[in-house]
């Protein structure tokens, strides 16, 4: 790695910082050693990250113990990265470039809608809770990046990318991207408790994601659990000064995952790949 601290620790303390001609002393042949002073002084950059979250809730209770809630939210995460390496930076000297600048920005937005309706009722030693809901989530990820090199001056840093002559030679880099996906869920949960001792929970969720293939977008995810609060039993009375809760639980459930890139289930085209045409491989 090129970390400044790592390079400083690796450095032979008897080696000079500067050559006699005023350039930085480098010793690339030994353990990929780079001058840490040069790394500090011959590059500049800025990185900013912002995270914004907005949430709104509306709850109403048409009848006693029955509540319905509407929740809307948006979360936006963005980062802005830019930097510049002078012609004295080790990578620029080794590649015979006079300055390198880059600029990139990325933004990830999540819009979420959730509607839930729950009911609870308690009588004698019994407790009953039920909940049904719907969730809609839309995600968008987009960004761009550009870089250029061979600058006549270091004055502008990353603030004038077009000044580098690599752009005129068709060697500058530029890229952008955007992808989106949708996640929808219907869910329900029922809970029953008796005398604060025994609790049963049953739930099911039907969820669909645009990331999956045409015939595999939806799935069912059931779950069940049984719990026993032993501290409410008479034979545990003498331990209540030491223990406040002892609740064995057994549970079973099926979960899913969609933490992979969008469009993996689709056949896509690009201009950089190769394909077989008329008995030979063609790029395009």
Name these PLM-found stretches:
Residues 186-204:
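Short, contiguous hydrophobic alpha-helices characteristic of membrane insertion segments
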Residues 56-60, 115-119, 132, 188-192, ...:
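Residues on the lipid-exposed face of transmembrane beta-strands in outer-membrane beta-barrel proteins
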Residues 1-51, 69-184, 232-284:
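Surface-exposed loop/interface segments of Gram-negative outer-membrane beta-barrel transport/assembly proteins
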Residues 210-215:
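Solvent-exposed loop/turn segments connecting transmembrane beta-strands
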Residues 153-154, 220-228:
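Feature captures outer-membrane beta-barrel proteins of Gram-negative bacteria and organelles
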Residues 57, 61, 67-71, 127-131, ...:
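Membrane-spanning beta-strand positions in outer-membrane beta-barrel proteins
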Residues 200-209, 250-252:
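Transmembrane beta-strand segments that form the barrel wall of outer-membrane beta-barrel proteins
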